[in-house]
From Swiss-Prot:
Keywords: Cytoplasm, Mitochondrion, Nucleus, Transit peptide. This is Required for respiratory growth protein 9, mitochondrial. Residues 89-117 are annotated as: Disordered. Its main location: mitochondrion. It is found in: Mitochondrion; Cytoplasm; Nucleus.
Length: 117
């Protein structure tokens, strides 16, 4: 095999590999552009889940990795894009300070509701 045929063979293999990875990249970019066009530029979901639900979604996904984003979205009544973003976001479990803040807020809301009753 002469050098020309060998170079051509390598080039063809590389270009086919590049085309396959480039095609996947293009599909991802198309989906990203479609989502941006659909949501109007920036992400602002209509239904926002509390932190406990987000932690539960992450836990469910870890336990049952076979569950798709669509299945989780139906379970929680949000869009699959919301679930995808929740899973992509950093996993931040509630710490003690945040739990105590929530308890204080809850107690304050009970006190204020009692004042109006």
């Amino acid at each position: 095999m002469n050098i020309f045929n060998y170079t051509t063979l390598i080039f063809r293999r590389l270009s086919s590999t590049f085309k396959a990875s480039n095609k996947a990249s293009i599909e991802w970019k198309k989906q990203n552009i479609a989502v941006k066009r659909k949501i109007g530029g920036y992400w602002n979901p209509k239904k926002k889940l509390p932190l406990e639900s987000m932690d539960e979604i992450r836990r469910l996904k870890k336990e049952k990795s076979s569950m798709s984003c669509s299945e989780l979205a139906k379970l929680y009544g949000v869009s699959p894009e919301s679930i995808r973003r929740i899973l992509k976001s950093s996993n931040r479990p509630l710490d003690d300070r945040e739990k105590s803040r929530k308890e204080k807020r809850w107690l304050n809301s009970l006190k204020s509701n009692r004042d109006f009753a």
